[in-house]
C-alpha cells in the first residue's frame, strides 16, 4: 500500500496525437482529449511518446504539441514530455527547448536502431540529464529499440539526481524487484505494459503509462487508485474487464488500434496516422470492437 505518493504515479496516459485529414496535428481534438483525461481522473499525461507518434513528427511539431498540451492542461494535470531520440544531441536539443516550459518531467527512450552498449546508454542518459533540471524518466522498450536497459545500468543512472524513474515496458514483472534493488525504493517504477501493469503494482510499482487509458481513462484511474490503496482484489475486477483491450490494442502496431478505437468511441474525429503507419485493417476491426464491448465501452 502506497502512503506517500511519488512525483509520478497511478494511471498516466500515453496520449495519442489526433490528426486531421491532411495529416496535421488536430489541436481542437487534442484539447478535447486533455479535457477527457482531466474529467476521468487520469493522473498525468505523456505528450508525444511512442503512442503519440513522436517518430513521425518533426522536432518543431513535437515541441508545439507538448506546449499546446501544457496550455490545454492549464496546471490541472501534470504533463510529461516525450523527448527521446536515438541521437543524443537531438534528445538534448528537444529537452533544452522545454527547459522553461513547465513540463513536469521528460520521458526519454533507450536509443533505437543504433543498439548502444550499456555504457553507451549510461552516457546518453547522463548527458541528457546534465542539460536540464527537469525530472527525467527512462523508457525501456526492447521490442521497439532492439536494446535492453539492464537493471544494473538503471542503478547507475539513479545516482544522477534528476533521473527519478523508469517506464519499464518489457512486460517482465521481475524487473520491479531487480530495479528497486539496483536503484532504491524511492526510484519510481512505472509499467509500460498494460497487460502486466496491475501485477507490477502489486509488486511495488507506482503506476502504469498506459495505452488502454486513452479510451478507458476512468476505469484505468480507478484501478490504479485501488492498487495504490492496497485494494488489489477490487483492482483486479476492473483489470479483468479491460484484459481484452490490453491485448487487442496491440493486434497491430501501436497506436494503430487505439487510434481507431478512439475514433469509434467519438473521442477523435478521424483515425488518421502518418505513414508508414496506416489505419486499422478491416480484418482486425471486429477484434477491437469485441474488446470494446467486453470493457463496457460499446
Swiss-Prot record:
GO terms for cellular component: cytosol. HAMAP family: DapA (MF_00418). The record marks 50, 113 as: Part of a proton relay during catalysis. Gene3D superfamilies: Aldolase class I. It is found in: Cytoplasm. Pyruvate binds at residues 51, 209. It catalyses: L-aspartate 4-semialdehyde + pyruvate = (2S,4S)-4-hydroxy-2,3,4,5-tetrahydrodipicolinate + H2O + H(+). This is 4-hydroxy-tetrahydrodipicolinate synthase. The active site is at residues 139, 167. It comes from Histophilus somni (strain 2336) (Haemophilus somnus). Its EC number is 4.3.3.7. InterPro entries: Aldolase_TIM, DapA, DapA-like, Schiff_base-form_aldolases_AS, Schiff_base-form_aldolases_CS.
Amino acid at each position: 500500500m502506497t502512503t506517500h505518493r511519488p512525483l509520478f504515479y497511478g494511471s498516466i496516459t500515453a496520449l495519442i496525437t489526433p490528426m486531421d485529414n491532411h495529416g496535421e496535428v488536430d489541436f481542437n481534438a487534442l484539447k478535447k482529449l486533455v479535457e477527457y483525461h482531466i474529467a476521468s481522473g487520469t493522473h498525468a499525461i505523456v505528450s508525444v511518446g511512442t503512442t503519440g507518434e513522436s517518430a513521425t513528427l518533426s522536432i518543431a511539431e513535437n515541441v508545439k504539441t507538448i506546449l499546446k498540451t501544457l496550455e490545454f492542461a492549464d496546471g490541472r494535470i501534470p504533463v510529461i514530455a516525450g523527448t527521446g531520440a536515438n541521437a543524443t544531441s537531438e534528445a538534448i536539443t528537444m529537452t533544452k527547448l522545454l527547459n522553461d516550459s513547465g513540463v513536469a518531467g521528460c520521458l526519454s527512450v533507450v536509443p533505437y536502431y543504433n543498439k548502444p552498449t550499456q555504457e553507451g546508454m549510461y552516457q546518453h542518459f547522463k548527458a541528457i540529464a546534465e542539460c536540464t533540471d527537469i525530472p527525467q524518466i527512462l523508457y525501456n522498450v526492447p521490442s521497439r529499440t532492439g536494446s535492453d536497459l539492464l537493471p544494473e545500468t538503471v542503478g547507475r543512472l539513479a545516482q544522477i539526481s534528476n533521473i527519478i524513474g523508469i517506464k519499464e515496458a518489457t512486460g517482465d514483472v521481475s524487473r520491479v524487484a531487480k530495479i528497486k534493488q539496483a536503484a532504491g525504493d524511492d526510484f519510481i517504477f512505472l509499467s509500460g505494459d498494460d497487460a502486466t501493469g496491475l501485477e507490477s503494482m502489486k509488486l511495488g510499482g507506482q503506476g502504469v503509462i498506459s495505452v488502454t487509458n486513452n479510451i478507458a481513462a476512468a476505469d484505468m484511474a480507478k484501478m490504479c487508485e485501488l492498487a495504490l490503496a492496497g485494494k488489489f482484489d477490487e483492482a483486479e475486477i476492473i483489470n479483468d474487464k479491460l484484459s481484452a483491450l490490453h491485448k487487442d490494442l496491440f493486434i497491430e502496431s501501436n497506436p494503430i488500434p487505439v487510434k481507431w478505437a478512439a475514433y469509434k468511441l467519438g473521442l477523435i474525429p478521424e483515425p488518421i496516422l502518418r505513414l508508414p503507419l496506416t489505419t486499422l485493417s478491416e480484418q482486425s476491426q471486429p477484434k477491437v470492437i469485441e474488446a470494446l464491448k467486453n470493457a463496457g465501452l460499446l
